Amino acid sequence: MAITAKDVMELRKQTDCGMMECKKALTEADGNFEKAVEILRERGLATAAKKASRTAAEGMVYADYCPQCKVGVVIEVNAETDFVAKNDKFVDFVKEATKVIMKQNPADVEALMACKTEAGETVDEALKNLILVIKENIKVRRFTRYEGVCSAYVHGGGTHGILVNFETTNDIDAKDEFVAYGKDIAMQVAAANPGYVDEASVPAEVVAKEKEIMLAQMAQDPKTANKPEAVKAKMIEGKIKKFFKENCLVDQEFVKDGDMTVAQYTAKVAKDLGGEIKIVKFARFVKGEGLEKRADDFASEVASMVK
């Protein structure tokens, strides 16, 4: 199978490995992208668990929560230049779209476009009018809507948007202390980028794949290759615990106090407020995540290497 420049660029973007290493891995994997990532990880060349998040698209991410109706929304709207994110009309459109999502609960972006705004026009009409004013291509890319107690947080003027959903008892969500706690958890998600809420939410196939990669790494390391299987199993157990600690929100060290985990901080706040708190789910949007502008010079460089 022919290896293209696009394939090499994408693998490099996601693994931070050198272009020649990426080309070799893709060749060995016969063009299978996932297998190439595994090969690089097994060789210790690629970082585990998380993909690189190089962003190039402009616009903004926004998140908001209505405590009266108990609905939260995080949304991403993309544009061509970074000037747009500072334009009042653009920001107003993003906030209006967020309100529409809260109130009308559209199934997806296409359904959102057909919803009516408070001004009586559809979101699609409002968007087209905005494009005429700003003279840039603008697109609502994605959104997530949660019902129930939430915390919404926007970081970096719209580079990151976080929405965290909770279950609580005894109306503790109305207390200022809970609001502060919710912001802390949302900031934790922004800073530490967990992949899952807890160990139970990590798919079994993900854990199995991690173990497989760890064993392959051990087999290629002279220090561990000849160790007894029982010793290797114990080492794998420790590595999996580390994986959970790094990738599960409740197991992570609390960013504002490294002496406790997020789970311990949650338990402390719940006890202080006289109720119970459970982190149910979260959404973490990064502006332009997975989107790239054209980079002709870099593309030419890669193309010359895969010929």
Predicted regions and their residues:
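N-terminal assembly/interaction segments in proteins that build large macromolecular machines
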Residues: 2-307
